[in-house]
């Protein structure tokens, strides 16, 4: 198997679109578009797994930078080991690029020096180039060759710089060491009459000056700041220590410090801002409350009045838009954590105005996102464990057998197909002959399930049920013979080692005509194990006959809204099977099981749109055909 990373994807591209594109290069095992845990929006990249490395290499060579939704995609080999990606070996940094140079232009320029693993031009939120980029070569030799050849060259009329990539931590460490050896000084907060000569006279006592400049406006007036460059580091440090904070009159205090580049200054300001924000958050932690679902008539004063009985309030604010209308939420800050806790206990859910309030401790955006992500992952883990621990017995209303492990994969390559059961997930609803309407006999299915959802026949149960209760005789031998004949006709087979009932034998679990109904068996027939006990699940309500009509989508949607997740799949399966059976009767069971891996919303769309269903069915048939061709002979 070979895996490719596909980046720079538009937000609306999904697995289906990528499958259509990459399947032309060769058999695709799986495709996964990476999405946000909470919003499920695409993160802009995906992984495509090919069966053969040659097919993946063909896709990389022929499809890299192809347009998808009028946007070029970026393809490279997937590096699963993060140490290889972050080592910096073979990585080259390019800056001073022309704004017209994109990823493809960089790739075409540098591919002459060696095999490129990845290349990227940095862009802003609008997709405009930031003027720098990166190229990752397979070998360090190719990277060094590109530096020697391209550094100082003209690309689109601009002289570019090409050098070895230095990780951010090393750059910051290097800048920190350089910061101690500065000679250039930044000066601000002096009066408007300060010119270049006055600036020189002011700083000259602290050492030899190589250059000095007061920045001025177009009319010649000072902007209030300037620069002084000393010959030695000692002189610059002495000037900073002596003059920083000096009173300049007119209420101004002189600011003198090491001159910084814009990016360095912005980074330092950002770091200080984060520190202040963290301190402010820590100071109000446990005392600041978030209040939402506020009535439109509630303002700051009414919010304070509502919360004032529970403690001393330091601030209360209802958030408003530009026109002063309430946004429906606000914040209340108490003096003590115990007061805030009391307010949450008493006011959460209480009606204030005309709406019940939601009151909780305020959280930062990052904390709230992390908390929601944690909740979502716990919920998904619980659902997986619940499905893993349950074995479902097909009941009279459905033939759906839930897969042991859930899967979000929509496309099934040959490797996935080899893991499929020989028997489909869908068990046929076997209608017993009239002579044995009460007999319950278990059998493993070999075909699909009954297409008609209304008037569902009684399903055969395991013959082992009689081992735990009374074993009444069936009057006559015709019922047993008919049951055995019916099982042969439906393709059912008994479990290995299970004795078949002879015509004159007693049938365990059978019902005497006109007698009371036997209790349902707690055993289940499978093709590879002996009658494992299964937990009793409640019977789902059979789907009404009217759902088989044309105008049934609204009724199905209403049933799904009131059903549990397992029952939703059963309802959709009962509706899909007869539609698929008309297209491919022999494969209807397997195809239905494959399609039920898809999300319910898309299944509903396929029920309404015959063309969409037909396309998806043909796709599943193609996968099964590939599986049959590639499956080794037994």
Curated annotation (Swiss-Prot):
GO terms for cellular component: catalytic step 2 spliceosome; cytoplasm; cytoplasmic stress granule; cytosol; nucleus; precatalytic spliceosome; ribonucleoprotein complex; synapse. Transmembrane segments: none annotated. InterPro entries: Nucleotide-bd_a/b_plait_sf, PABP-dom, PABP_1234, PABP_HYD_C, PABP_RRM1, RBD_domain_sf, RRM2_I_PABPs, RRM_dom. GO terms for biological process: chemical synaptic transmission; dorsal/ventral pattern formation; male meiosis cytokinesis; male meiotic nuclear division; mRNA splicing, via spliceosome; oocyte development; oogenesis; positive regulation of translation. The keyword RNA-binding applies. Core component of the neuromuscular Atx2 complex, composed of at least Atx2, tyf, pAbp, Lsm12a. Interacts with Atx2 (via PAM2 motif). Atx2 and pAbp form a subcomplex that can associate with the 5' cap of pre-mRNAs independently of tyf, Lsm12a or me31B. Forms a ribonucleoprotein complex (RNP) containing at least me31B, eIF4E1, cup, tral and pAbp; this interaction is required for the translational silencing of maternal mRNAs during the maternal-to-zygotic transition. Binds the poly(A) tail of mRNA. Since it interacts with the cap-associating translation initiation factor eIF4G, it is likely that it functions by linking Atx2 to the cap-binding complex. Forms a complex with tyf and Atx2 which functions in adult circadian pacemaker neurons to sustain circadian rhythms likely by switching between activator and repressor modes of post-transcriptional regulation via interaction with Lsm12a or me31B, respectively. This is Polyadenylate-binding protein. It comes from Drosophila melanogaster (Fruit fly).
